[in-house]
Amino acid sequence: MSSDNTADFYKQSFGFWMANKIDYNDNPEKYQEAMSLYHQAQKIYIRDRKIKIDRFESTIENYRRFDARNQLPENPILFVGSSSIVFWETANSFSGYPITNRGFGGASLPEVIHYYDDVIKKHNPSMMVVYCDIDVENGKSPEFSVNAFKELISRFEQDFADIPILLMSMKPTLIDDIFGAEVRTNKMITNQQLIKYANSKSNLHYVDITSPMMDDNGKLKSEIFLNDGMHLNPLGYTFWDPVMKAAMDALRMP
């Protein structure tokens, strides 16, 4: 299938699904046949999902310049990961905590590892908070994602033995099924594997930020997302803030 045809398919399909994402979330049975056909078509119209490892170099360079010109917290609680970290106003949400936020772009775990020295090691953290769901959303398997988390954490432990790590669960979004048929399921599988991994290590702590995003009927709260259906709006982060505060407080040195 030509790249032009593939691009046109996704442009039209995304337009439809984005316009109906909230209704789909609330009434998925109405769209069962349409979504099934869409997923079948995705097997024909295959997107190029290759990631250039240094695609966020300009963002990292901006961090380098900022770090060189400003006094940063010593031994901060370091937030790293993808766009959910970027958009999180951590300085406001956790005022009084020594926070450094080094999320960038829609970073995948291999990209975080690639820029490890810039976004993690140089900051000498007293605690690290990690969030990244990009790999699964980009079609990678739970095994790929878990292994990437393990690689990142292993490298961190070599430099910062026994420093606590808060590993955030992968959040559901309104457009998981638009990304692909297995994305929502693979996020849940990944979360279960991360729980097992965290339980095997004394310095690693799994934080469930998914449950507060669901209503009493088990449906995802549509009102907590930006219009893109993927990123949290300010209301959405108010559901994360108390969960993370409790997790950080439980691990901070007295």
Regions found by a protein language model. Name each.
Residues 1-76, 90, 95:
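N-terminal secretory targeting modules
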Residues 49-110, 229-234, 238-239, 249-250:
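Mobile, glycine- and charge-enriched loop segments
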Residues 70-73, 93, 121-122, 159, ...:
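Extracellular/periplasmic catalytic domains that process cell-envelope and extracellular macromolecules
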Residues 80, 85-93, 98-100, 110-147, ...:
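Oxyanion-hole/transition-state-stabilizing segment in secreted/luminal serine hydrolases
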Residues 143-152, 183-191:
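Charged helix-capping and loop-helix junction motifs
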Residues 160-164:
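A short helix->loop->beta-strand "cap" motif at the edges of active sites that frequently abuts
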Residues 172-254:
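Catalytic His-Asp segment of secreted/periplasmic serine-dependent ester chemistry enzymes
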